[in-house]
A protein has these predicted regions:
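A short beta-turn/loop motif at secondary-structure boundaries
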Residues: 25-27, 68-72, 110-111
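Extreme N-terminal tail/first-helix region
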Residues: 1-17, 133-137
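Charged, gly/pro-rich active-site loop segments
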Residues: 2, 74-137
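Short beta-strand segments
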Residues: 14-48, 54-56, 64-66, 77
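Hydrophobic alpha-helical segments typical of transmembrane helices
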Residues: 3-7, 52, 93
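A short, polar/proline- and glycine-enriched secondary-structure boundary/capping micro-motif
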Residues: 53-59, 75, 137
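Short, surface-exposed beta-strand-loop junctions and turns on beta-sheet-rich folds
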Residues: 50-52, 71, 133-134
Length: 137
């Protein structure tokens, strides 16, 4: 699927995402994550022993919610699946993502079991509501 340029722009900025994976009993597990985007695929890194990786190895389906950091009324909802679990022990993908969020390489250098997920988007919805984020003081 070719991503809408507005979705790509939202994913390309340092916005936090929340990934939902499925537990063995079918219940959801949601985790905040950093993400990257390349060639209409979403990139995400984690440790091999993390719950989200274990869940995705068992069932590669996932959902992502991404909200603009400065305008929480701009968001994307994404469904997809992991199409590749790639070794990232050299932190090539993780550092690329970390630079986007912090301007620095990823600080925790634990290469054993470092994995990058390559996620194929199956459905994406972009929304921008006409509201100003002005919560009461």
């Amino acid at each position: 699927m070719s991503l809408d340029p507005k979705v790509v722009a939202l994913l390309s900025r340092p916005n936090f995402a929340h990934i939902a994976t499925l537990m063995p009993d079918g219940s959801p597990n949601v985790t905040p994550v950093w993400i990257g985007v390349r060639d209409d695929k979403i990139l995400l890194c984690s440790g091999e022993s993390s719950l989200k990786i274990r869940n995705l190895r068992r069932d590669p389906r996932l959902a992502l919610s991404v909200v603009d950091f400065h305008d929480p009324y701009e968001e994307a909802q994404i469904r997809g699946r992991v199409v590749e679990f790639r070794d990232d022990s050299k932190f090539e993908i993780m550092d690329e993502i970390s630079y986007k969020y912090t301007g620095k390489p990823f600080p925790f250098r634990n290469p054993e079991g470092r994995v990058a997920l390559i996620i194929k988007v199956e459905k994406a919805r972009y929304t921008k509501l006409p509201f100003q984020h002005t919560p009461p003081a």
